[in-house]
Design a protein with these regions (language model features):
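Conserved N-terminal structural module of periplasmic/extracytoplasmic solute-binding proteins
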Residues: 2, 10-13, 18, 24-100, ...
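Loop/turn elements at helix/coil->beta-strand transitions in domains of secreted/extracellular proteins
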Residues: 40-43, 63, 86-89, 142, ...
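Short helices/loops that flank or line small-molecule/ion binding pockets
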Residues: 75-87, 91, 95, 99-105, ...
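Hinge/lid segment of periplasmic solute-binding proteins
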Residues: 98-154, 275-278
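Helix-loop-helix "hinge/cap" segment bordering the ligand-binding cleft or interdomain interface
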Residues: 118-119, 135-240, 299-305, 386-389
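Extracytoplasmic/periplasmic substrate-binding proteins
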Residues: 228-303, 309
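Long, aromatic- and glycine/proline-rich binding clefts that accommodate carbohydrate-like moieties
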Residues: 324-379
Length: 407
């Protein structure tokens, strides 16, 4: 059995390497047929805020489409060309702010609604994707981009401590911590109030704001429980170095799931059946997707069929099955990746259940809304303001902000 597992992993790694080389434009085109005498229609692909290694194939559909990639680097020059009417056929971009790249916001009139492409397609449908993903990425009922891979941000606890993980609130975790001698801390020292609040800001943008109606609703028990959860961390600042507590002595562990293989090793790592509890909402718990490379079709694209063919190629089960820098966004490919990773049936079930608990998505931040939430919480965290007063302040400031920005 050991050698069978090793050989399966070698084969998977080899296939993954082939796909990576193809994605970099260094291998043979997506189709292995000889090029036709006529050059296919050109698809101009702009790569913005993304490294060259993410470049995709150089031709598609037996050379029906010839792909030309342009590396824009920073987004300012690209936006200037776009607004001047010089749009590419497709844009590849980093959907999540990362390092020096701020991320590109495509939720505007310059880009097509990709639901129209999905709904008209004969092989790809909304149900092809991971549960809740498209809804989480949508704004005002429109889907302006798709992503190639995702991570899932969540919290994990042991079943012996939390049962099935349903219906938990911050007060429940405090009670479990007090009743169980094994656990010395709710979090390890790397999980600070501010790092938790960053995640709450991501959740809040989807859960408590309505851009279409320029409104928000932070005055609810769900948002209060999230702020309580942040304040339950005893750590105000991140301390570089090793955690004060052993892995076995912390009740909740933060996980950023970016590989199906992680589901294989988790039972051994936790020494008990792991439970994906997410962020507390008094129900199933909530987790969120972190979007990686994004694809968007400009409204002024001159080759929209070719642009959609490019996206479909990158989202095919064959290409998705061996995504190495995250989790596949196509459900069938995700399930196959679990099988390829020798994940147990029980953990496969838990992984699929986690998808149902993953309700939101991080893409491009609303920096103004985040600033309102983080600034308003400082007095609550240092003990000079009550939770109710803090929520009132956030609701008041955010209401004005939403009206001004989206009204």
């Amino acid at each position: 059995m050991f050698w069978v597992m090793i050989m399966k992993k070698i084969v998977s790694a080899a296939l993954a390497l082939c796909l990576i080389l193809s994605a970099c434009g260094e291998a043979a085109p997506a189709e292995t047929q000889e090029p036709s005498e006529e050059v296919g229609s050109v698809v101009k692909v702009a790569c913005v805020c993304a490294q060259p290694s993410v470049f995709g194939p150089t031709s598609l559909n037996g050379y029906e489409y010839q792909i030309t990639h342009y590396d824009y680097g920073e987004q300012e020059r690209y936006i200037a060309d776009l607004t001047a009417g010089d749009a590419p056929d497709l844009v590849l971009f980093r959907a999540r702010p990362f390092g020096e790249y701020p991320g590109l916001d495509v939720n505007n009139e310059y880009y097509d609604d990709l639901y129209e492409y999905i709904d008209a397609d004969d092989t790809l449908s909304r149900e092809s994707f991971l549960p809740n993903l498209l809804e989480a990425m949508s704004r005002g009922g429109e889907l302006k981009f798709l992503c190639r891979q995702v991570e899932i941000a969540t919290f994990v606890a042991r079943e012996s401590a939390v049962g099935d993980g349903y219906g938990l609130l911050p007060s429940d975790y405090e009670r479990i911590l007090a009743e169980n001698e094994r656990y010395l801390s709710l979090f390890d020292t790397f999980v600070t109030k501010s790092s938790l609040l960053d995640s709450v800001c991501i959740i809040s943008e989807s859960a408590f704001t309505d851009r279409e109606n320029a409104s928000c609703d932070f005055d609810n028990d769900y948002f209060r429980s999230l702020l309580e959860f942040c304040n339950s961390s005893p750590y105000d600042e991140y301390v570089d170095g090793q955690s004060t507590y052993d892995f076995d002595n912390t009740l909740l562990k933060r996980e950023y799931l970016s590989s199906a293989l992680r589901f294989n090793v988790m039972p051994g790592v936790y020494g008990d059946d792991p439970v994906f509890v997410g962020f507390p909402d008094g129900d199933m718990g909530c987790s969120y997707y972190i979007c990686g490379l994004g694809y968007a079709i400009p409204a002024q694209s001159s080759n929209k069929e070719g642009a959609w063919a490019y996206i479909k190629h990158m989202l095919s089960v064959e290409a998705q099955r061996y995504v190495t820098a995250g989790l596949p966004v196509i459900l069938e490919a995700f399930e196959l990746a679990l099988e390829d990773g020798d994940v147990s049936e029980e953990m496969q079930y838990k992984a699929l259940e986690l998808l149902e608990r993953t309700k939101y998505a991080e893409s491009v931040h609303d920096a103004g809304l985040k600033e309102i939430i983080t600034d308003s919480c400082q007095n609550y965290f240092d003990g000079t303001a009550t939770l109710d007063d803090t929520v009132d302040i956030i609701q008041s400031r955010a209401s004005v902000y939403m009206s001004e920005q989206y009204g």
